[in-house]
């Protein structure tokens, strides 16, 4: 993809309900021509079953982030309040830091990261977006067409 000047913003790969199939969610920005070219490049790969452009479709989209935040005795309560307000979850609490799991859209996670940046981010990792089209249809049905 990079050789064709497509910059991938996020990439998520996972198992599906089919043992022999994995699903990739690739997020990239570009005009309609660029998106179409990216789809054509993906179809040239071995064993690509379906490329689905959901740019203009109603979708559910989330990503996950783990954020290790510097947390001292003096600011720990403030940090934990921000976690609660952001619907995050504390997954590790240690002397001097707290690891938080946050899920949401890219902008929701960006907002949380901005809010806690003033306390000091010791480490940050994000999954990239996973996306599913809303409604009763499925990618499996699209593959069979």
What annotation goes with each model-predicted range?
Residues 1-145:
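A conserved regulatory-domain signal marking ACT and ACT-like small-molecule sensing domains
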